[in-house]
Amino acid sequence: MGNSISKVLGKLFGSKEMKILMLGLDKAGKTTILYKLKLNKIKTSTPTVGFNVETVTYKNVKFNMWDVGGQQRLRPLWRHYFPATTALIFVIDSSARNRMEEAKEELYSIIGEKEMENVVLLVWANKQDLKDAMKPQEVSDFLELEKNLKNQPWCVIGSNALSGQGLVEGLSWISNNTNVPKK
């Protein structure tokens, strides 16, 4: 019943649909985030080899979320997922301070690509529940986004994939900062 009502409202008022590419280093929490958003539960996962695709609906917006494996040997394949991307979610394990430079290099190699220059960028500073986690502002400062992304909308939001903290806020920010026509 509720599903049919949302379909009718979607037809009346229009709904947005967008491709979200979720990337980041291995063990950052991408797959945990995806299934927390989709199922509202923690799904035991192994390192993603390849990709997972799920549709998450939030406030009349369909997010077709592509979670692509982050192991070093898979990163050269990321570019094959760039076409038609509306927003990039880059997930960072904010407690892994020793991997921040590597994460920064990978992020800039992605957003430096022609196909990605007009996408909005959300960085989820994940694992905020851990003691040594960098705060979102620290992550933002380290990544130097304000200095380097003058013409691209971006935001850093603290998240905790296990509790769901920051996840809805991230989807809301993407929805409010993209210009996708309603269907």
UniProtKB/Swiss-Prot annotation:
It comes from the Eukaryota. GO terms for biological process: actin cortical patch localization; actin filament bundle assembly; cellular bud site selection; endocytosis; intracellular protein transport; invasive filamentous growth; invasive growth in response to glucose limitation; positive regulation of phosphatidylinositol biosynthetic process. One of its GO terms (molecular function) is GTPase activity. A lipid is attached at G2 (N-myristoyl glycine). GTP binds at residues 24-31, 67-71, 126-129. Keywords: ER-Golgi transport, Golgi apparatus, GTP-binding, Lipoprotein, Myristate, Nucleotide-binding, Protein transport, Transport. InterPro entries: Arf6, P-loop_NTPase, Small_GTP-bd, Small_GTPase_ARF, Small_GTPase_ARF/SAR. Pfam families: Arf. Its main location: Golgi. The keyword GTP-binding applies. Interacts with RUD3. Present with 1240 molecules/cell in log phase SD medium. GTP-binding protein involved in protein trafficking; may modulate vesicle budding and uncoating within the Golgi apparatus. Belongs to the small GTPase superfamily. Arf family. This is ADP-ribosylation factor 3. The lineage of its organism: Eukaryota, Fungi, Dikarya, Ascomycota, Saccharomycotina. The gene is ARF3.
